[in-house]
């Protein structure tokens, strides 16, 4: 059986890099609970979203897994007018994503941060 970390990464790669809607049947619970304010709950909402993401690119950064939770730091380009840096949090049960939260913020270039450090570093 795949680890929870492997499940979350396959979901993100399948949905946002490969645009493969079959990840929904393989890795999402039918009763999937979504906490993003613009995406409805239910695996069908994700299946409907994937084909609309033609101009999206996604990069994976840090990944942390603890118990049934997996957090992935990522960068989305093409979701909105500016690149977004996000943390996606997945709850995984029996190899299926059962719940998801995310926090997204417009990316600030390293040259404009107080520290001079970037908000996102690819894996």
Kindly give the residue locations of the regions a language model identified.
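C-terminal and inter-domain tail/linker signature
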Residues: 1-123
């Amino acid at each position: 059986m795949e680890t929870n970390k492997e499940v979350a990464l396959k979901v993100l790669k399948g949905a946002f890099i490969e645009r493969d809607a079959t990840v929904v049947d393989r890795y999402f619970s039918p009763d999937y609970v979504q906490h993003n304010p613009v995406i409805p709950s239910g695996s069908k909402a994700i299946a409907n979203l994937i084909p609309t993401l033609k101009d999206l690119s996604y990069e994976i950064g840090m990944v942390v897994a603890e118990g049934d939770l997996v957090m992935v730091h990522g960068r989305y380009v093409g979701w909105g007018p500016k690149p977004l840096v996000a943390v996606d949090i997945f709850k995984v049960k029996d190899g299926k994503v059962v719940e998801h939260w995310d926090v997204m913020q417009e990316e600030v270039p390293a040259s404009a941060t107080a520290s001079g450090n970037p908000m996102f570093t690819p894996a």
